[in-house]
């Protein structure tokens, strides 16, 4: 049975440790082999691009790019609409540029099929301004469920999404009516069987697993045959994306892999206004993976991504062999050599963790890194401890990891999670609403080799509403909060009580946040020390609790050295402590009461 994690892992696999799936083995446009010119500026209309969108602009845009020099060049799209024919190639491919600027002047770039619109590799000091990315035919369809059974559904597909029964359906995402519009129900199926046309715009879809879709609910059918990102940056530095919008993409809207010093200003991943679409990108909204320096994210608007709204993570690398006392071979998740932009530079510190528990074993500086078949070889000036062997995990140390600074951002819902992050994150003055799962998830993910453990995270002055409304009942040990801090990304679903999580997370501050209308507790934290929850406000939490049960505002499992104080609630609710030490101090929290188990 394919689960959500497996499907989303497939959609994002190219961007984690092995990063080069889309960069390797794909037919490229002739531009990739064309030497750069020496022009400082090129307007695509001067090379024949049609700003009315009536003609294919591919050749004209590539002619314009071919004239540009590698330093301080500017590519200009005059205002208008530019259409691009379907292809399995990278349409605009830049490598080794410095000072590149791409100005859109509000232009809409409309793509088709599996085309990858824009890829930049090993570029420095680059800017992209004022462009909107769209697909002529979205890589999904949506409609209304007319019949539903345990092993199949009949869907009346909206006329805006023409279907003939030959479309491949990779996943089904359920939505139910809620107030002003549909919200993700949390009913999602990734194991889809045969599809048959049963009349004009009516599809009968077999399911390989049981699902609880309801007649009358809205549903989205994901079709993408690839995990193509609309914008992909690999190994780039000093990046500015400003007023760039993405209405859909077959995979993530934006992927930044192995990049440094990123500024995202007014980036939007949203359904096309007025389209009535329930989702935007078919993968994550924005992925910031294995990056360094600072990522400053301001005024972003994220809505409707099928995966996480934003994902900020580092890769775990598993030792496949200790070659000698001062070198180790590390395996990539895709079995390929690690691309150059992901090799840690000389002097980079790596943290070393025990695979079974994620317990930190120490840190070591890299003296040399080189790609080898199946991964990379790291060499060190120091001698490795005998405790380090096959299976041990390496990850960038905290001093080398990216620092996320997020301010004034809006996450407006989707069928999964708003923000996934791990460490060195400051999230302020932002709002999260309408997610089937948590608004913010902080947890390492060994299944997909993403980390590190949670450390040095501050979430302040944010609002959370209408989250964790998925149709499911969680037993003790499986809770998720609007903010969830855990030792694993998914709850442990077992017949017996969940195992006590290892205490590996630390240094989390949650202050002056407002929580309301939540299906689950506002905060769930497991396996942590030094959690500070102060001056938050809670209202109408835990709405999906069992009948007769008292609502839970906060659930804490196996915590130490933590403080929960000065919080307020509009109604009685509980602070639940499970397997916590006596160094967890809870008090002065208005009508919130303490419960220990």
Predicted features and spans:
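The right-handed parallel beta-helix/beta-solenoid scaffold, focusing on the short coil/turn
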Residues: 73, 80, 90, 98-100, ...
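Small/polar beta-strand repeat architecture
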Residues: 181-228, 360-363, 368-404, 408, ...
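Right-handed parallel beta-helix/beta-solenoid
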Residues: 29-60
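N-terminal secretory signal peptides and thylakoid transit peptides that target proteins
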Residues: 1-18
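N-terminal extracellular ligand-recognition/capping segment immediately after the signal peptide
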Residues: 45-49, 58-66, 70-100, 104-119, ...
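Ser/Thr/Gly-rich low-complexity blocks that favor extended beta-strand/coil architectures
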Residues: 111, 135-137, 142, 158-198, ...
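Short glycine/acidic-rich loop motifs that flank beta-strands on beta-rich extracellular proteins
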Residues: 86-89, 111-117, 137-141, 228-230, ...
């Amino acid at each position: 049975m394919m689960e959500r994690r497996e499907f989303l892992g497939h959609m994002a696999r190219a961007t984690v440790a092995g990063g080069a799936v889309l960069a390797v083995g794909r037919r490229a446009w002739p531009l990739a082999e064309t030497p750069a010119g020496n022009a400082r500026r090129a307007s695509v209309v001067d090379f024949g691009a049609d700003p009315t969108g009536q003609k294919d602009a591919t050749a004209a845009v590539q002619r314009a790019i071919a004239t540009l020099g590698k330093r301080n060049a500017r590519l200009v799209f005059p205002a208008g609409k530019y259409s691009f024919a379907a292809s399995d190639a990278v349409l605009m491919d830049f490598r080794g540029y410095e000072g590149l600027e791409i100005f859109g002047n509000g232009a809409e770039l409309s793509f088709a099929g599996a085309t990858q619109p824009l890829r930049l590799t090993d570029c420095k000091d680059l800017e992209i301004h004022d462009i909107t990315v769209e697909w002529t035919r979205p890589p999904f369809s949506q409609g209304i469920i007319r019949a539903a059974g345990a092993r199949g559904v009949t869907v009346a597909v909206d006329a805006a999404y023409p279907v003939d029964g030959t479309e491949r359906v990779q996943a089904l995402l359920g939505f139910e009516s809620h107030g002003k519009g549909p919200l993700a129900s949390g009913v999602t199926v990734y194991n889809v069987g045969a599809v048959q046309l049963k009349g004009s715009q009516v599809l009968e879809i077999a399911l390989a697993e049981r699902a609880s879709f309801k007649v009358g609910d809205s549903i989205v059918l994901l079709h993408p045959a690839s995990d193509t990102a609309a914008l992909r940056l690999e190994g780039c530095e000093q990046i500015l994306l400003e007023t760039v919008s993405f209405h859909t993409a077959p995979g993530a809207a934006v992927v930044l892999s192995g990049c440094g010093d990123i500024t995202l200003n007014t980036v939007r991943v949203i359904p096309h206004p007025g389209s009535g679409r329930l989702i935007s990108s078919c993968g994550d909204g924005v992925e910031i993976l294995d990056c360094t320096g600072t990522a400053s994210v301001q005024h972003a608007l994220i809505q409707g991504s099928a995966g996480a709204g934003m994902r900020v993570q580092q890769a775990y690398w598993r030792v496949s062999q200790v070659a000698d006392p001062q070198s180790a071979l590390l395996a990539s998740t895709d079995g390929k050599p690690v691309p150059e932009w992901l090799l840690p530079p000389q002097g980079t510190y790596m943290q070393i963790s025990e695979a079974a528990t994620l317990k930190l074993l120490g840190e070591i500086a890299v003296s040399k890194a080189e790609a080898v078949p199946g991964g990379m070889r790291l060499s060190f000036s120091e001698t490795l401890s005998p405790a380090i062997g096959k299976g041990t995990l390496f990850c960038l140390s905290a001093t080398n990891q990216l620092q996320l600074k997020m301010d004034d951002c809006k996450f407006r819902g989707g069928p999964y999670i708003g923000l996934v992050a791990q460490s060195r994150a400051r999230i302020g003055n932002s709002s999260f609403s309408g997610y089937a799962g948590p608004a913010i998830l902080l947890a390492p993910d060994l299944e997909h080799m993403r980390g590190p453990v949670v450390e040095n995270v501050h979430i302040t002055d944010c609002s959370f509403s209408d989250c964790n409304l998925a149709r499911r009942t969680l037993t003790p040990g499986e809770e998720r909060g609007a903010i969830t801090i855990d030792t694993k990304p998914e709850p442990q679903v077992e017949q017996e009580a969940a195992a006590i999580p290892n205490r590996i997370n630390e240094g989390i501050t949650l202050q002056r946040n407002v929580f309301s209308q939540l299906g689950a507790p506002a905060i769930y934290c497991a396996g942590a020390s030094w959690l500070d929850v102060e001056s938050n406000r809670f209202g109408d939490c835990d709405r999906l609790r069992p009948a007769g049960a008292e609502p839970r505002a906060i659930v804490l499992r196996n915590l130490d050295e933590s403080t929960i104080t000065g919080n307020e609630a509009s109604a009685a609710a509980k602070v639940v402590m499970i397997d916590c030490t006596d160094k967890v101090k809870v008090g002065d929290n208005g009508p919130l009461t303490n419960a220990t188990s």
